[in-house]
């Protein structure tokens, strides 16, 4: 019991010392970059990653050395692009989301260059969507290419069920401090959605249709405190 009490007292003392000698930091910034996304259909749909854009604003609060929190408000394009292999057909369905990730921020390095990891939950709202195609996808069931193929085509005309999405995101990157106030950062991030975009009841075609997105962004932070 004494050992446990001593251990807890020592930990508390270390935390108090760290907080005493470390000055908290508050930074705001902006970022932009590219996204690559797909929809995890089950049964599977032949597709390739759909490229898009992402941009947003960032808030970072660091209370202890090597540890902090980051919140962002981003606009990101997601969706999927059908893979028709050797055919000239083209179909993609793009979603535009407003994202709010809140992540734990862990960093390491020196004053000039730092590496970091971010991990946390994310909630999203779909603001709009659009389909781009070079054929009458509404009539795909009557087209010879699709009647002779075993691929699913129902997703091309299916109505969206959930415009609210939540999931888990995680990323890693590098930050370069230009001086005491300004810094640049490069980050790669992966998002895995936990909500299905399309209906997923037993009578529906797809049992899952969640989003998966990779983003690569370049950002800028300005330190307020």
Region spans (language model):
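Bacterial Sec-dependent N-terminal signal peptides
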Residues: 1-27, 218-224
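Predominantly the C-terminal beta-signal and adjacent terminal strand-loop region
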Residues: 165, 170, 176-225
């Amino acid at each position: 019991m004494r050992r446990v009490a001593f251990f807890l007292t020592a930990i508390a003392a270390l935390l108090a010392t760290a907080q005493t000698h470390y000055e908290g930091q508050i930074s705001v910034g902006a970022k932009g970059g590219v996204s690559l996304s797909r929809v995890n259909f089950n049964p599977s749909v032949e597709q390739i990653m759909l490229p898009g854009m992402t941009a947003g604003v960032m808030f970072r609060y660091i209370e202890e050395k090597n540890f902090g929190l980051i919140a962002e408000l981003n606009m990101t394009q997601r969706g999927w692009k059908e893979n028709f292999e050797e055919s000239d057909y083209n179909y993609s369905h793009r979603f535009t989301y407003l994202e709010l990730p809140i992540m734990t921020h862990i960093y390491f390095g020196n004053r000039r260059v730092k590496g970091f990891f971010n991990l946390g939950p994310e909630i999203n709202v779909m603001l709009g969507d659009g389909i781009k195609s070079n054929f009458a996808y509404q009539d795909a069931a009557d087209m010879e290419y699709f009647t002779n193929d075993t691929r699913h085509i129902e997703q091309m005309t299916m109505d969206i069920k959930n415009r609210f999405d939540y999931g888990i995101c995680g990323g890693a990157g590098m930050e370069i401090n230009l001086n005491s106030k300004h810094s640049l950062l490069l980050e790669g991030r992966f998002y895995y959605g936990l909500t299905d975009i399309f209906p997923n009841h037993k009578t529906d075609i797809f049992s899952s249709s969640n989003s998966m997105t990779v983003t690569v962004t370049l950002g800028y932070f300005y330190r307020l405190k």
